[in-house]
Design a protein with these regions (language model features):
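Single conserved hydrophobic/aromatic residue that forms the stacking wall/gate
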Residues: 1-10
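Short internal beta-strands
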Residues: 11-16, 95-97
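Short acidic low-complexity segments
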Residues: 32-41
Length: 188
């Protein structure tokens, strides 16, 4: 309906979700998927994916007068808020996730530049074993929501062993729907 009203093509920054059926349906309705805001005409319309966006992407969209709809998953938004809250208290933050994944890029991009802490990305157990932290006694942990609990379990245990005072979120960051699907596949 919005496309008809504006007679414009809606461009989605990244695929909205990791769901082929949804993506194909949107494509059949004329949606175009782009990687960067520079691929969207000024005054264009865009949808930000469920993976979330960095502060810089949001600022650029506003600066260019793009009409945008933020489809960030509520669980991803929760992680963004945790990062901001932890950063405001000057904590160092470790994020467990995959480099270059849109969700990780968006979450890392929510870390305020004026924080007294630092943000680190840990992708695997080897990195968890070797990471050097500026504030090991003032440290917290967040995770990419689309990882499975089993993917992060060893990493979290290693980080807790190395940094006994590390704070975790009050509730799990892993998406329960993702975990349920992964558990179902494993049970086959």
């Amino acid at each position: 309906r919005l496309r008809r009203q504006r007679q414009m093509c809606i461009r989605d920054r990244h695929e909205v979700v990791h769901n082929r059926k949804v993506v194909e349906d949107l494509k059949s309705r004329g949606a175009k998927f782009v990687d960067e805001l520079s691929e969207i005409p000024d005054d264009g319309i865009t949808i930000f994916s469920a993976h979330g966006i960095s502060d810089q992407v949001e600022k650029e969209a506003k600066l260019r007068n793009l009409k945008f709809f933020d489809a960030t998953c509520p669980l991803v938004s929760k992680v963004h808020k945790e990062v901001i809250r932890f950063a405001q208290t000057g904590k160092d933050i470790i994020m467990i996730g995959h480099k270059n994944h849109p969700e990780v890029e968006g979450t890392l991009g929510r870390f305020p530049g004026d924080s007294k802490g630092n943000m680190y990305l840990v992708e695997n157990l080897l990195q968890a074993e070797n990471i050097e932290i500026n504030q090991p006694n003032n440290l917290c942990l967040v995770t990419q929501t689309t990882l499975s609990v089993s993917d992060t379990e060893e990493i979290v245990l290693k980080l807790k062993e190395r940094f006994p005072l590390i704070l975790e979120p009050k509730s799990e960051d892993i998406c329960y729907a993702t975990q349920n699907r992964q558990d179902a596949v494993l049970s086959l």
